[in-house]
Amino acid sequence: MPVDKNLRDLEPGIHTDLEGRLTYGGYLRLDQLLSAQQPLSEPAHHDEMLFIIQHQTSELWLKLLAHELRAAIVHLQHDEVWQCRKVLARSKQVLRQLTEQWSVLETLTPSEYMGFRDVLGPSSGFQSLQYRYIEFLLGNKNPQVLQVFAYDPQGRARLREVLEAPSLYEEFLRYLARFGHAIPQQYHARDWTVAHVADDTLRPVFERIYENTDRYWREYALCEDLVDVETQFQLWRFRHMRTVMRVIGFKRGTGGSSGVGFLQQALALTFFPELFDVRTSVGVDSRPPQGAADTQG
């Protein structure tokens, strides 16, 4: 149907009798969603709306990311490789969306932010329960974080539940063990509240996979999916740190942290260290025995 006079007529089949029926706004509860932006500055600072929406939309994407990562764990528990890869693919796209969102907040100038920063009090993104939940799902376990949520017993209980359960990576290692890979016994059952750190005893497992990709294609593909997730997560962390640096410089954070310096430390935290370390030894014909010192300087 051609458009005449820059006007598009409604088609006969379009529903207009919506009284008492499910609508777009009703399904999405837009009345609640769009009334949740309540600036605290008086008079309301124009740019506080940007700040609120930036963080609210981030929390929505984090909710979806947690949903997908939980599904990935369940799929691994049931050896459902392709279903796991599907939700990991979506997780990567969510992380890209979260990363690109920082470009919107970067339009906030230092003076604009300082115009309403005082109303934030001690509130801080560090207190994002969903962010900590996702870090725990991915393996960055830190029981100290629970202290931050002492004011929220229900939220703290949610965090404790995921703290005490195997992470995505630990479920992946258990999956590998079920399919005949020589995963050390401690990864079958251990204190899951302790963060995973790089372990040289796992390197032979991943050398075998990466040097025999035709034979272990499913395992290799999952490894690369996890590498993609960590890489994108670190890009998000980096953009966060750079955005904070751009807006507030090296001021302390509202939550009491050192600000940029504290965010920089997060860039050294890893989820799946062996999947990066293995690349150093892949294809090397002669490797020193495990634990041998490097004498080549």
Curated annotation (Swiss-Prot):
Substrate binds at F51, I52, I53, Q54, H55, Y113, R117, T254. It catalyses: L-tryptophan + O2 = N-formyl-L-kynurenine. Keywords: Dioxygenase, Heme, Iron, Metal-binding, Oxidoreductase, Tryptophan catabolism. GO terms for biological process: L-tryptophan catabolic process to acetyl-CoA; L-tryptophan catabolic process to kynurenine. GO terms for molecular function: heme binding; metal ion binding; tryptophan 2,3-dioxygenase activity. Pathway: Amino-acid degradation; L-tryptophan degradation via kynurenine pathway; L-kynurenine from L-tryptophan: step 1/2. Binds 1 heme group per subunit. It holds the Pfam family Trp_dioxygenase. Its cofactor is heme. The keyword Cell division does not apply. It comes from the Bacteria. Its EC number is 1.13.11.11. InterPro entries: Trp/Indoleamine_2_3_dOase-like (IPR037217), Trp_2_3_dOase (IPR004981). Heme binds at H240. The keyword Metal-binding applies. Heme-dependent dioxygenase that catalyzes the oxidative cleavage of the L-tryptophan (L-Trp) pyrrole ring and converts L-tryptophan to N-formyl-L-kynurenine. Catalyzes the oxidative cleavage of the indole moiety. Belongs to the tryptophan 2,3-dioxygenase family. Homotetramer. HAMAP family: T23O (MF_01972). This is Tryptophan 2,3-dioxygenase. It comes from Xanthomonas oryzae pv. oryzae (strain KACC10331 / KXO85). The gene is kynA.
